[in-house]
């Protein structure tokens, strides 16, 4: 639970593909739900016990899948800070684009991200254009996603 859902003031865009560089399939959902079978792929052995989540994933076809209600905390940012404030999970919403740093996102993803962002900005007025950022900017020594969105 967040201390104060009215404090939601940051939107963080990420990317994810499981296995890395591969799109489609059930693995992202399984990962966020803690149900990823480590035996399905060698990379999964590294991440299967991790407990992470995002509020939503936007698939390659533009489908938005929500995992965590927006007023609750998701575990997407890790060790992070924005504008001098640490612990971005406490006050942000995390959106994952199914993709990678080196493969362009689809038009359908951009459209869905635009619509979702507009709705979130209406619901959470402290999320303004300067407070929409990529994971690489809140955790610059650890992360490179979402790349050049």
Regions from the language model: what does each represent?
Residues 1-86:
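N-terminal catalytic cores of peptidoglycan-degrading enzymes
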């Amino acid at each position: 639970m967040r201390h104060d859902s009215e404090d939601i003031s940051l939107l963080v865009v990420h990317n994810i593909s499981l296995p890395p560089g591969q799109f489609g399939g059930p693995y992202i959902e399984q990962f966020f739900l803690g149900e990823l079978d480590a035996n399905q792929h060698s990379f999964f052995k590294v991440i299967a016990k991790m407990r992470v989540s995002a509020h939503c994933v936007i698939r390659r076809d533009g489908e938005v899948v929500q995992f965590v209600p927006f007023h609750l905390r998701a575990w997407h940012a890790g060790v992070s800070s924005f504008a001098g404030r640490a612990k971005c999970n406490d006050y942000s919403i995390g959106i994952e684009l199914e993709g990678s740093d080196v493969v362009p996102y689809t038009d359908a993803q951009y459209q869905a991200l635009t619509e979702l962002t507009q709705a979130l900005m209406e619901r959470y007025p402290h999320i303004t254009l300067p407070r929409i950022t990529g994971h690489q900017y809140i955790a610059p020594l650890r992360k490179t996603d979402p790349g050049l969105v």
